[in-house]
């Protein structure tokens, strides 16, 4: 129901008299340009939201790179990220509000995430707890930790007006946010490309590829897993610190569903750029671009009128769909191979 609905309804069912019908038709023609203007205004609002969606997508893309390390390289499901993301935001906001240098606050956010990843790694490797359960345990513990960091408050604001000169990213300055996010993405990908090209990086990749063979070659797989958890959650917390600056507050629940968004970004990047991006650095970039595409799609869906409450359900459906694609492809390939084998057997 909008401003022009009465006119449209009246024209759809005109009054008995021809004069009444002509009157409605005349006014419908008069307001038609305004209907077009309304549509153009909606499209303009969507286009104006794109830079913000790109900036936010890049921030979440950094988080997706962290998830990429455990999910793709170590072949482990780590649910710590839902907690460590909020930890990074909480540490950043509290430190910045306390007068700390913003770069030092970002570093502390990263280290807090590394500590969370270390705990998960120890629970998994030293206590024999499955990775997914170890991540859940750490995530639950981090909820209380995040509340303590924010002095028992569920939400801690960070005024963009008061700290506008020191914040690296902010909703009030999208252009600066895009540049800063681009720099962070480039530096992180460059550092990870270098790291995974070292002997330690190769051993970490070997651990995720084939643990038994890695152990046979004298690689300490337990230590490598801990390192992977540490690096992954450090990047996730760094992303949380950037998002806290961008939105102007830290919330104890800001990381809820982060793992799903991270998986969505990785899968979208793999589906869209998988055949083009073969290099390791480009695969990391694909995860970031997947996050950007995800948030552009979210903006478009909201523009179409989908209730914001349904976004989590939509994200879960998209992730489930794309995770099932490889399975379906395998089943189809099996059906094609079997008839070919039967033909050869008959021959």
Q: Can you name each region flagged by the protein language model?
A:
Residues 9, 20, 30-43, 325-347:
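Transmembrane alpha-helical segments of polytopic membrane transport and secretion proteins
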Residues 32-63, 99-104, 166-170, 174, ...:
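Membrane-interfacial amphipathic/re-entrant helices at transmembrane-helix boundaries
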Residues 48-101, 106, 122-127, 267-277:
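Single transmembrane alpha-helix segments in multi-pass membrane proteins
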Residues 100-140, 145, 185-186, 290, ...:
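Alpha-helical transmembrane segments within multi-pass membrane transporters and channels
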Residues 116, 174-259:
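Helix-loop-helix "hairpin" substructures at the membrane interface of multi-pass membrane proteins
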Residues 131, 135-197, 227, 251-252, ...:
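Transmembrane helix-bundle core of multi-pass membrane transporters
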Residues 209-216, 220-223, 282-285, 297-347:
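Cytosolic-side transmembrane-helix boundaries in multi-pass membrane proteins
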Residues 236, 240, 246-313:
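Transmembrane alpha-helical segments in multi-pass inner-membrane proteins
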């Amino acid at each position: 129901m909008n401003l022009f609905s009465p006119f449209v309804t009246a024209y759809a069912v005109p009054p008995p008299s021809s004069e009444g019908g002509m009157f409605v038709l005349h006014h419908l023609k008069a307001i038609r340009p305004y209907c077009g203007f309304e549509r153009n205004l909606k499209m303009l609002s969507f286009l104006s939201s794109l830079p913000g969606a790109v900036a936010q997508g890049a921030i979440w893309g950094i988080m997706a790179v962290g998830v990429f390390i455990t999910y793709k390289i170590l072949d482990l499901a780590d649910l710590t990220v839902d907690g460590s993301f909020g930890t990074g935001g909480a540490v950043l906001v509290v430190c910045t509000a306390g007068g700390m240098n913003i770069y030092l606050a970002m570093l502390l956010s990263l280290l807090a995430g590394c500590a969370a990843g270390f705990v998960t790694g120890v629970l998994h490797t030293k206590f024999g707890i499955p990775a997914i359960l170890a991540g859940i345990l750490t995530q639950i513990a981090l909820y209380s930790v995040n509340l303590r960091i924010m002095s028992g408050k569920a939400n801690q604001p960070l005024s963009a007006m008061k700290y506008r000169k020191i914040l690296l990213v902010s909703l009030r300055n999208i252009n600066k946010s895009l540049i800063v996010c681009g720099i962070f993405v480039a530096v992180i990908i460059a550092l990870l490309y270098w790291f995974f090209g070292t002997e330690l990086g190769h051993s970490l990749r070997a651990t995720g590829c084939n643990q038994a063979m890695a152990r046979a070659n004298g690689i300490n797989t337990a230590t490598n897993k801990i390192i992977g958890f540490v690096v992954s959650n450090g990047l996730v917390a760094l992303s949380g610190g950037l998002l806290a600056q961008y939105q102007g507050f830290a919330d104890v629940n800001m990381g809820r569903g982060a793992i799903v968004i991270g998986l969505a970004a990785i899968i979208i990047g793999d589906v869209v750029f998988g055949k083009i991006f073969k290099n390791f650095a480009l695969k990391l970039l694909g995860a970031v671009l997947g996050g950007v595409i995800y948030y552009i799609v979210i903006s478009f869906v909201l523009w179409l009128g989908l209730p914001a409450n349904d976004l989590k359900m939509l994200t879960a459906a998209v992730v489930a769909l794309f995770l099932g694609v490889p399975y379906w492809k395998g089943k189809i390939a099996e059906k094609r191979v079997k008839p070919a084998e039967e033909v050869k057997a008959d021959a």
